[in-house]
């Protein structure tokens, strides 16, 4: 079916699906009221079309008046349907039709109009009318998998009942009510989709895209048989009875046979591609695998990986299934794959890569595998023989009726295994057996319903059963207590119980496809008894006389037990077994230590247990289906001889238990709280520290959600942390923990630091919780201290700024007037002493002004408020300008300033003004503390490690280490040694503000450089400033 949108996507919309299920005529139009986007069968019929395809994507020619009426109601911005009466058709045939018009949103968000009306014929067949062709098949399926209505060729697809049940379950679990995947039809799989239309009662729309098998197409084109087909056959059979049996065999031999598979042991390794969906279902596999292991063995598309692994026997530790759940890349996983038609299995290595959509939606895995036929090994379970379609060719059929009856149970179990490997394959033509295998509605072709014919056959079965038991006592049973066919049967039973309990089995109304075989005269089959009919004595005569314990049951419901079972278990009657608990009370599959047993254990009425071997058959019982379970006690000869290994295992187990106890003790001793969480987010257990931390008893918190341990404002953060780890995202790699607020049992709150890790085997989590109350208290104290220090610093800066403003104004007046008076511009000063006083006033004023400026600069640096403009600065040029400014003062002091600048010195990243100020401060101190005749040497260099270094060396008086420490403190001056004075008898070290070196060091560090000073008394001082490579603009 054509169209811009898949038919089933629109049929599953909430505004469409219920009307579709009722059989309403529905039409989805674009807003131009001409383009038909979607229509169902009744809707196409309403406008005169027989098929949906004839109208979808076409132009609908509505009358102008009808368009106007629909457009008037569709302009309302509401999704509620509006009723409108219009006339459809033309001339005398026009009819008044009541339509319901509503606005809907298509799957891609495009707005459209839904036009619908009720139709007289609301049957299921009418709902899907106009749909389906040679390559498209439509069906309506109810809640139990029954096909309510279908397109003509749907039955030819041969979809099994179990497949329909799986599709119904998946559609019910889907959030958008649609499941799209490949669906198994007969021996192949084709693309299809199923949508859940209604919930009460449940009704599903199933769409399949694919041609029916060729052998069924011919049958579909043939004329159906009339109702009196049986009478016609009775007339034809005598006429053909004279033909010899060789003619029938010749006819069968002349039919074309499918090409058989032959395993090539010497073939080179083959590489194949495979894909699975988000649920682990195989969606694609390349034919390279089938070329090595056989087509039946590689026909796994549409099946879950866990199911295939369970049937093929390579589900050992579940590691691959766990990797499929983790959604991460993996490789190097090895398993053994059975080879069709052989007793071999070949090693296969698998690797996979997760696939995501653009919206990071997980789409499944895409991987490759390598199969190595040259390394094939023997398969103890011989699964490959079952995949080949039955008994190997070198086995001769047994013609004796008794032998055939004895092997029926095993053949039936084999048929169950074959159904898993090759679902619904046509059965081979076999001679008529002494047991009548009658088809029953609700069962697939591979299920066998056995009805016993006569007392003679019953006696033969009993004799052969007794003979079989004697031979079994002498034979050595395989490992695990079960034969390969029995083990395959149990796998199939587990598969079916997983999908749907046998207690809820039902009879389906569809008639199974008959097997292809030559026509032979048959004896009339006794009618099947209904449940209401009383049990006939001959129906249970064989079972009652058997010496083997037998149970007839369906799921947990027990229908019949024989006397041998009552004798071995110690129960008086069947009612006693039912009242004690039924099937569950009879069997125990776990040992005392909780480990799963390899064989079944029968529990007696007194509580004692006995190992038994089991044999399972599918039989007809009271007109329905049931399972017959026969038990064979395991004798002492069958049990393995005691060895020294169990003793060693006991010692190892005791050591392991002691180690576990030690670990528990360590966890309880730890001061941090440890909480174990299951995959659903519930608390499994906690140690003593966690119990004391939150005030909960261990058993009180177990089973409750992990979020109960946190305050409301931290619950979301804690659960997001947990979900982030389960999704294999960034948190699973960068797990840095979380700070949360815990909630005590009494309502108090605790600050906690939480770290969660994943547990590898249980898929759970482990949370470690640490009480950080003391950390928070210390952090709060440090925060308060920092705030107090910042407040004091701001107060000091504010005070200095205010004092500076108050001092600058009178200082400027004093300095200005003193300079004016010293210049005698308004008249001479009669006395030279007054001139000296004026010079002292001017010098003192400038000194105080420099002090105020230095105070402001150092306060700004300490507060981080100094305005600095970082740019490329030429260090040589900055120092050269400072030398030029200090040269007059050095000449007056008779101090020589020498410079040594490295050529091609790279620029540095610094504040130009502060670099000049640093150079001036260092040169000023060097000139001031150097005696006349001394030298000051300024140099720059570019080191090999990328550093740029500035050095200022003088030959002055120098300082000791204690004096250097004192000089680097603000407002501290060196008041020391007498005798080191200038020629004017004035101690130059008592001059200054005491801020020169501290301010210089602060400016250097503000420019991200390093400040160092080295001085010795009487030898001079060296100041070194290093700019690291990160502050150097090298070429």
Curated annotation (Swiss-Prot):
PROSITE patterns per record: HIS_KIN, PAS
UniProt superkingdom: Bacteria
Pfam families the record matches: HATPase_c (PF02518), HisKA (PF00512), PAS (PF00989), PAS_8 (PF13188)
Matching SUPFAM superfamilies: ATPase domain of HSP90 chaperone/DNA topoisomerase II/histidine kinase (SSF55874), Homodimeric domain of signal transducing histidine kinase (SSF47384), PYP-like sensor domain (PAS domain) (SSF55785)
Residues recorded with modification Phosphohistidine: 805
The reaction(s) this protein catalyses: ATP + protein L-histidine = ADP + protein N-phospho-L-histidine
Interaction with DivK: annotated segments: 614-1035
Annotated stretches, region: Important for polar localization: 1-613
Cited InterPro entries: HATPase_C_sf, His_kinase_dom, HisK_dim/P_dom, HisK_dim/P_sf, PAS, PAS-like_dom_sf, PAS_fold, PdhS_histid_kinase
Role according to the record: Functions as a polar differentiation marker. Essential protein that, by localizing in the old pole of dividing cells, controls cell division and maturation, probably through control of DivK phosphorylation status and cellular distribution, which in turn regulates CtrA, a transcriptional regulator of the minB operon. The asymmetrical localization of this protein is probably required for cells to enter a new division cycle.
PANTHER family: OSMOSENSING HISTIDINE PROTEIN KINASE SLN1 (PTHR43047:SF72), TWO-COMPONENT HISTIDINE PROTEIN KINASE (PTHR43047)
Full protein name: Cell-division control histidine kinase PdhS
Protein species of origin: Brucella suis (strain ATCC 23445 / NCTC 10510)
